[in-house]
Amino acid sequence: MDTKQAVLDILNELTGEDLSDQMDENIFENGLLDSMATVQMLLELQDKCGVTAPVSEFHREDWDTPNKIIAKVESLRNE
């Protein structure tokens, strides 16, 4: 599964929303993810995408849209 689809699947599971046509929507400002869902998202990304993003190094502005999450996951994969 490619990164984009994996991220969209995870976000769909957590928010109940199909965000594929809202790739630049701020998921925090729109109330789609709260702090608990954010931790769950990071755990799911670790499990499904093989990347580790510690909560202590999580900066919301770097992860606030589906496109930014995809870019961050791809960046972490390339480290």
Swiss-Prot record:
Molecular-function annotations in GO: D-alanyl carrier activity
Highest taxon above the source species: Bacteria
GO biological-process terms attached to the record: cell wall organization; lipoteichoic acid biosynthetic process
GO CC annotation terms, alphabetical: cytoplasm
Listed pathway(s): Cell wall biogenesis; lipoteichoic acid biosynthesis
Main location: cytoplasm
Keyword Cytoplasm: yes
Protein name as catalogued: D-alanyl carrier protein
